[in-house]
Regions:
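A short acidic, often aromatic-flanked loop/helix-cap motif at beta-alpha or helix-coil junctions
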Residues: 17-20, 97, 154-157
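Conserved beta-strand scaffold positions in the cores of enzyme catalytic domains, especially
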Residues: 8-10, 88, 147-149
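Conserved GTP-binding G-domain of TRAFAC-class P-loop NTPases and closely related GTPase folds
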Residues: 100-185
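Short, structurally constrained coil/turn elements
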Residues: 4, 82, 141-143
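ATP-dependent NMP and nucleoside kinases share a basic, alpha-helical "lid"
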Residues: 66-109
Length: 185
């Protein structure tokens, strides 16, 4: 933050679901499935914030799932048109560990009195399955000159600047297909 003079905003669509005009009503009616009914609203809020904040020159860290390639490409194009340097940074986590993390987050939010957000397993698994192919596509298209992959401990596992001829999606393929260690089970 120091190098950007505190001018950094973290944008995550999950943070905006609670501002849906019918959020309480949707929570009461659908419970854990309310997330499905606030998804479109949260996405529109995220796009509007990215548009407004980038117009004012804020540095942005945008959280996403890479469920598609269209959203990151559209965001990249908008930001580049406004003079931004854009990079793609990913955190490599096995699908099983990732889904367990969503369950833990749900429980923790419930325990501290926040409205928890349940991630449907089918949706989680769809995203986990598609991330490898979407990352491969973005790499092949040279869509982002800077791509980095980190583990949850913050260690950089891949940096396109250092290994430009290695497809980062291979890291995900390898990690997703290896046997779980005894400690992970």
């Amino acid at each position: 933050t120091r190098q950007h003079s505190g001018n950094i905003v973290f944008v995550s669509s999950d943070d905006y679901r609670k501002y849906h005009p019918r959020y309480g009503e949707l929570q009461a009616a659908y419970g854990d499935d309310a997330v499905l009914h606030t998804q479109k609203f949260a996405g529109k809020m995220t796009e509007a914030l990215i548009d407004d904040l980038s117009a004012f020159g804020y540095h942005l860290i945008i959280e996403g799932t890479l469920r598609t390639t269209e959203v990151p490409l559209r965001t990249r194009d908008l930001l580049r048109s406004r003079g931004y340097d854009v990079s793609l940074n990913l955190i490599l986590v096995r699908p099983e560990v990732s889904y367990l993390g969503t369950l833990k987050r749900y429980q923790q939010m419930k325990e501290i009195g926040l409205t928890p957000r349940m991630t449907p397993k089918e949706h989680h698994d769809l995203v986990a399955r598609s991330i490898v192919d979407h990352l491969h596509t973005l790499y092949e298209q040279d869509a982002f000159p800077e791509i980095r992959v980190y583990n949850r401990a913050g260690e950089c596992l891949y940096d396109r600047q250092k290994t430009p001829f290695r497809d980062p999606s291979e890291l995900f393929r390898e990690e997703f297909s290896r046997d779980l260690s005894h400690e992970e089970c």
